[in-house]
UniProtKB/Swiss-Prot annotation:
EC number(s) given by UniProt: 7.-.-.-
Coiled-coil boundaries: none
The protein's name in its UniProt record: Ion-translocating oxidoreductase complex subunit C
GO cellular component entries: plasma membrane
Main location: membrane
Binding of [4Fe-4S] cluster 1, residues: C378, C381, C384, C427
Record-listed [4Fe-4S] cluster 2 binding positions: C388, C417, C420, C423
HAMAP family xref list: RsxC_RnfC
Gene3D superfamilies: 3.30.70.20, NADH-ubiquinone oxidoreductase 51kDa subunit
Molecular function via GO: 4 iron, 4 sulfur cluster binding; electron transfer activity; metal ion binding
Family: Belongs to the 4Fe4S bacterial-type ferredoxin family. RnfC subfamily.
Length: 665
């Protein structure tokens, strides 16, 4: 910190590497005083005009609003509000073309002016020191002030983040880019208000040194600031050489102190804070006049504009209307740029509105603009590296961007590129290096945003898992406490702990299971000691009887539920008859009479079974038929062995007749 101040106090100016001296072209617009354009009828106010997040709407369609009324609100210093540039009615809130080279739409408020230009109630003050630094920062935030030098970073957030670190406060009045003269004219005409805004910021930050840096090509502005200071020594002026891009933050700090801001760090890390002169004017108007940021100075220049100069322009005014009021000669062959020729953005749609970012509208003719030359191969001449004010290697970054080697692009400090456009300006191969670098930055940003969202999702998932585990543990703890309470209650009412009693019963059961089994013995006739298996044999006998009884029950059940197949039984009987006839021819003993009678009885039984079957059911049971046939064959075989007389033939014939009758039936 002290090193920064000692170097600054030496009064020496350092020169940064690289840089160029393009034609200034500032005389087109800096000779005329600040003017106002006619109040328009339609204003398009984007909800987000700063580097940060969009505020929350305070109005709806059809509402009547006054000039300076807040249309959105935020919940943090980086969520700046936007305000009504005039009084009128809210016609719609919907997407509208953005002031961006992409030409995409963004959420926008359409305000139709009533022509009265009526302010909201304001509370101006004369002495800002009656308010605390915190109150002043809050008022700056409520006024919606963002950096008007081009970065549009929320001013209140920038001040608060550096509040305890600032030793050197630099007010940037360099305005180094060609054509642009809005800061020059503002310093010439509103120097008193700029100085008051600087003193408000000094009161908030308490820096040891405050300096206004102005390029030496603005003698009128330098004189006006000196006059406004009236010999005061609390603010000093440093006149710096005209060189592009001396107005860039890191380059101007190096010019005044000889110290480089570390890569990836902010200027506040070395005790320096920088603000634009236009921002100082806006701070004064917000604190002293109680006016939010609803207008800014815009340079209208280029040979296609008849009334060149610097104008007070209400934010939200369509660019087409501004150009028309300034005498713009429309020509589709020549584009319109928002900003200067080095860092400006080509506008695809002139219906886009002026925002806090727009400091210049450039409308060149054929003498100032030509179609880009055809891109050729890089010849590695090192012109871009020699001219780069940030000590980068644009030719290497070009190859990395083309091959989408994002890791190498970051290793070669692409993020430090200030997009000043010098590399493309000096390139003999007409390579649009800035376009490549902007696209590469956008791709890297998208990759990091995707990774950031993935990490956030992982954190949320892990937090959810931890919460679920915690809730599960709490649930178990509640269950344990409830169980303990029940045990204590039972112990008090019944005199014993149920859990303890259950454990004792379990222990007793295990003890019984482990006791040795007593083996019974008996003594034989010979005096030998033998195991007594009486109980075991009785158990076996009981199990055998149980199995037999179960089988008998199953058989009886099957006989009751499954009827005999009459046809199968008849066939079996016929087979038995044939075998009996064959056997009867060889048997002739008198015993055949009795056996033949037995066969007749069997036939009668079969007949009875068939009749019973026909009475009970018409269903067929193949299994029963097979059993009946087997029984008939066995009985026929037995009869054949006993029959030996000739009478058996007659009896067998009789049996055959009976079977045939049965079949016929």
């Amino acid at each position: 910190m002290a090193d920064v101040l000692s170097r600054f106090n030496s009064g020496k100016l350092w020169d940064f590497k690289g840089g160029i001296h393009p034609p200034e072209m500032k005389s087109q617009s800096n000779s005329q005083p600040l003017r106002h354009l006619p109040l328009g009828t339609d204003f398009y106010i984007p909800l987000k005009q700063h580097l940060g997040t969009t505020g929350n709407l305070l109005i709806k369609e059809g509402d009547y609003v006054l000039k300076g009324q807040a249309l959105t609100k935020g919940d943090g210093l980086r969520m700046l509000p936007v305000h009504a540039p005039t009084s009128g009615t809210i016609k719609s809130i919907k997407p509208y073309v953005a002031t961006h080279p992409s030409g995409l739409d963004e959420p926008t408020i359409h305000l139709q002016a009533d022509g009265l230009d009526q302010w909201i109630e304001r509370n101006p003050i004369d002495d800002f020191s009656t308010l605390s630094p915190e109150q002043l920062i809050h008022k700056i935030y409520q006024a919606g002030i963002a950096g008007l030098g081009g970065a549009v970073f929320p001013t209140a957030a920038k001040i608060q983040s550096a509040e305890q670190k600032v030793k050197l406060l630099i007010i940037n009045g360099a305005e180094c880019e060609p054509y642009i003269t809005c800061d020059d004219r503002l310093m010439r005409e509103r120097a008193d208000e700029i100085i008051k805004g600087i003193r408000i910021l000094r009161y908030i930050l308490h820096p040891e040194k405050v300096v206004i840096a102005i390029e030496d090509n603005k003698p009128e502005a330098i004189s006006a600031i000196r006059t406004a200071l009236q010999g005061a020594n609390d603010i000093s002026i440093r006149v710096i050489p005209t060189k592009y891009p001396s107005g860039a933050t890191k380059q101007l700090i190096y010019l005044l102190t000889g110290i480089e801001v570390p890569s990836g760090a902010r200027s506040s890390s070395i005790g320096v804070l920088m603000q634009n002169v236009g921002t100082m004017f806006a701070i004064k108007r917000a604190i002293i006049n109680d006016e939010p940021l609803i207008e800014r100075v815009v340079t209208l220049t280029g040979n296609k504009i008849a009334e060149k100069g610097n104008y007070w322009v209400r934010l939200g005014t369509p660019i087409s209307q501004i150009l028309s009021d300034a005498g713009y000669q429309f020509d589709k062959h020549f584009p319109i740029f928002a900003g200067g020729p080095m860092m400006g953005l080509e506008l695809p749609n002139l219906n886009a509105p002026v925002t806090k970012l727009v400091n210049c509208l450039l409308a060149p003719d054929y003498l100032e603009y030509a179609e880009p030359e055809a891109e050729q191969a890089c010849i590695r001449c090192s012109s871009c590296s020699d001219a780069c004010p940030v000590n980068l290697m644009p030719q290497q970054l070009y190859w990395f961007a083309r091959s989408e080697d994002h890791k190498k692009s970051e290793e070669y400090a692409l993020k430090d590129c200030i997009e000043c456009g010098i590399c493309a300006y000096v390139c003999p191969s007409h390579i649009p290096l800035i376009q490549y670098f902007r696209q590469e930055k956008a791709k890297i940003w998208q990759i990091k945003e995707k990774q950031k969202k993935s990490d956030e999702a992982k954190i949320r998932f892990e937090a959810k898992q931890a919460r679920m585990e915690r809730e599960e543990q709490e649930r178990k703890a509640r269950s344990q406490r409830a169980a303990q309470a029940r045990r204590e209650e039972l112990a008090q009412t019944k005199g014993e702990d149920p859990v303890k009693a259950a454990l004792e019963r379990l222990k007793a059961k295990k003890a019984n299971e482990t006791e040795p089994t007593q083996i019974k013995t008996l003594t034989s006739e010979k005096g030998e000691v033998l195991p007594d298996n009486t109980d075991l044999m009785a158990q076996r006998k009981a199990r055998r009887l149980a199995r037999q009884q179960a089988a008998s029950q199953v058989e009886n059940q099957e006989q009751q539920t499954q009827p005999t197949d009459a046809k199968k039984a008849a066939v079996a009987a016929a087979i038995a008859r044939a075998k009996a006839k064959k056997l009867a021819q060889t048997n002739s003993t008198s015993e055949a009479i009795s056996n033949s009678q037995t066969a007749e009885n069997e036939v009668e039984k079969t007949k009875s079974a068939v009749e019973k079957t026909e009475e009970n059911s018409t269903a067929l049971d193949p299994k029963k038929a097979a059993v009946a046939a087997a029984i008939a064959r066995a009985k026929a075989k037995k009869l054949a062995q006993a029959n030996s007389t000739s009478e058996a033939i007659s009896n067998s014939q009789t049996a055959e007749n009976e079977v045939e009758k049965q079949i016929v039936r």
